[in-house]
């Protein structure tokens, strides 16, 4: 069960990355935490924040402190 939760978290973080990328391309600015939640089906802003924190640790996104629309997806180098 723990492995399933980890996989679900990875899939959700991938969806969050994709949502941020698509939203930014469409609007020319990043989404808020609430908009991300609405976009990926999470009701809790705290859950979105937790996933964003994990994504920062993994090096998948950058943020600016105290800025609500300052999330940047870091493209993976292959």
Explain the meaning of each model-derived region.
Residues 20, 52:
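DNA major-groove recognition helix of helix-turn-helix
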Residues 34, 53:
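Residues within the helices of the helix-turn-helix
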Residues 42-43:
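The short coil/loop that forms the "turn" connecting the two helices of the helix-turn-helix
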Residues 56-64:
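A short, conserved structural fragment
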């Amino acid at each position: 069960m723990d492995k399933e939760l980890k996989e679900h978290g990875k899939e959700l973080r991938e969806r969050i990355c994709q949502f941020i990328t698509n939203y930014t391309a469409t609007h020319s600015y990043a989404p808020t935490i609430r908009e991300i939640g609405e976009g990926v089906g999470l009701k809790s802003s705290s859950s979105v924040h937790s996933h964003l924190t994990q994504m920062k640790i993994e090096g998948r996104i950058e943020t600016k402190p105290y800025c609500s629309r300052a999330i940047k997806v870091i493209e993976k180098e292959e």
